[in-house]
Amino acid sequence: MIGRLRGIILEKQPPLVLLEVGGVGYEVHMPMTCFYELPESGKEATVFTHFVVREDAQLLYGFNNKQERTLFKELIKTNGVGPKLALAILSGMSAQQFVNAVEREEPAALVKLPGIGKKTAERLIVEMKDRFKGLHGDLFTPAADLVLTSPASPATDDAEQEAVAALVALGYKPQEASRMVSKIARPDASSETLIREALRAAL
């Protein structure tokens, strides 16, 4: 199916990006750690995609590189982990941070993510660690955690509302999302900055 898209970014509404390719607009769901690295609207971007078909929808998930996509595909093979939860996991921490948490057997780092309880965290560590034995060489080098940066978008009046909506889409309850954003909100912050700082504070 669709494995890669290259086109112009029409809209960025975390965690969704609308990418125009050949006159067709594709809605792509992206982990926030990948979303932060996208260029601004109107610029060209390339995303590696995974196509998911459900009874009620057909969804595209996008990533900045093949390694992140591979990790996402391995995550959704885990019992009890669907695309939405996998997206939340890779939004709350970088792919490298997740790999590190699994290899160091740190369930406490995972239970801080929305939708991850103790049993799910332990199951992820057991199942993913076994898969990493064959995949790690193709995923990430055992280096320091990835440092993700992107130019901040101009602040908007509804930046806080956009940030809350994005956190809810990632699995946080509305009241919890509002509380997370209010703790770090400031007038000059863009929605992307608020989301990034809220997720960082949650960990």
From Swiss-Prot:
It is found in: Cytoplasm. Residues 143-154 are annotated as: Flexible linker. GO terms for cellular component: cytoplasm; Holliday junction helicase complex; Holliday junction resolvase complex. GO terms for molecular function: ATP binding; four-way junction DNA binding; four-way junction helicase activity. InterPro entries: DNA_helicase_Holl-junc_RuvA_I, Hlx-hairpin-Hlx_DNA-bd_motif, NA-bd_OB-fold, RuvA, RuvA_2-like, RuvA_C, RuvA_C_sf. Residues 1-64 are annotated as: Domain I. It holds the Pfam family RuvA_C. One of its GO terms (biological process) is DNA repair. Residues 65-142 are annotated as: Domain II. Keywords: Cytoplasm, DNA damage, DNA recombination, DNA repair, DNA-binding. Residues 155-203 are annotated as: Domain III. HAMAP family: DNA_HJ_migration_RuvA. Homotetramer. Forms an RuvA(8)-RuvB(12)-Holliday junction (HJ) complex. HJ DNA is sandwiched between 2 RuvA tetramers; dsDNA enters through RuvA and exits via RuvB. An RuvB hexamer assembles on each DNA strand where it exits the tetramer. Each RuvB hexamer is contacted by two RuvA subunits (via domain III) on 2 adjacent RuvB subunits; this complex drives branch migration. In the full resolvosome a probable DNA-RuvA(4)-RuvB(12)-RuvC(2) complex forms which resolves the HJ. Has three domains with a flexible linker between the domains II and III and assumes an 'L' shape. Domain III is highly mobile and contacts RuvB. The RuvA-RuvB-RuvC complex processes Holliday junction (HJ) DNA during genetic recombination and DNA repair, while the RuvA-RuvB complex plays an important role in the rescue of blocked DNA replication forks via replication fork reversal (RFR). RuvA specifically binds to HJ cruciform DNA, conferring on it an open structure. The RuvB hexamer acts as an ATP-dependent pump, pulling dsDNA into and through the RuvAB complex. HJ branch migration allows RuvC to scan DNA until it finds its consensus sequence, where it cleaves and resolves the cruciform DNA. Belongs to the RuvA family. This is Holliday junction branch migration complex subunit RuvA.
